[in-house]
């Protein structure tokens, strides 16, 4: 089973990608990583927050030990990187 990490998943583009993957690939575990700064909004993901294949993790992608632990804990097999400060 694939385990996909989507960084910036609560942002403008990321939330659309998260919802697409959660709904299109129910066999995959979709992990949304976002720091929830000015652009991230969990309300964007309200419709998938109870999905069995969806997990939200609040963390900074610049915090390497935290990201490494997250990758190991969720057995991530692929990453879609959309996190950015603009």
Residue ranges: model-predicted function:
Residues 1-86:
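N-terminal Rossmann-like NAD(P)+-binding domain of SDR-like oxidoreductases, especially those catalyzing
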């Amino acid at each position: 089973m694939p385990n996909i990490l989507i960084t910036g998943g609560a942002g403008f583009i990321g939330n659309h990608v998260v919802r697409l993957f959660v709904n299109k690939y129910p066999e995959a575990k979709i992990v949304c990583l976002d720091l929830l700064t000015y652009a991230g909004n969990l309300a964007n993901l309200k419709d998938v927050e109870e999905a069995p294949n969806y997990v939200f993790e609040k963390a900074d992608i610049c915090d390497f030990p935290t990201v490494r632990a997250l990758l190991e804990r969720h057995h991530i097999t692929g990453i879609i990187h959309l996190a950015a400060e603009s």
